[in-house]
Design a protein with these regions (language model features):
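N-terminal loops that bind phosphate or other acidic moieties
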Residues: 2-64, 69-132
Length: 132
């Protein structure tokens, strides 16, 4: 068994990131589902869909949910699903997702930490020299 991965984002952002990560890695080693939330959708209906995905993905080791924007509808849906077998990380980016997919044998807690680190480490500013 391994941790399941549920990606909840605005529109097709999650699907696009997952497709790109699979091309980069050549595989998707975790059981993964994406849920794209349309802009004008009913959050309660989307919560039901997310719960269905969660049931499919939970195989005993937990589920990691990645969302794109803290405080948004996808993030709010994910926060309602959080429990002792479900971890939620916001701020999804491609480096975070690739990091998660690179460690399919980690525990839920370890994978959540890898996700957070991968997301942070993937942000590298290239700033112009400060004016003198």
């Amino acid at each position: 068994m391994s941790v399941g991965l549920l990606i909840i984002t605005h529109g097709d952002i999650g699907r696009s990131l997952l497709d790109t990560a699979v091309v980069v890695m050549g595989t998707c080693p975790l059981q993964t589902e994406t849920l794209g939330i349309p802009m004008a959708s009913d959050p309660d209906q989307q919560l039901e869909r997310a719960q269905q995905y969660l049931q499919q993905l939970e195989q005993g080791d937990g589920v990691l949910i990645l969302t794109d924007l803290y405080g948004s509808t996808p993030s709010n849906i994910a926060s309602k699903l959080r429990n002792d077998k479900v971890a939620v990380i916001t701020g999804l980016n491609l480096p975070m997702l690739i990091r998660v997919l690179n460690y399919p044998t980690l525990t839920l807690h370890e994978l959540a930490e890898k996700a957070t680190g991968g997301g942070r480490e993937g942000i590298i500013p290239f700033m112009p020299d400060a004016p003198t």
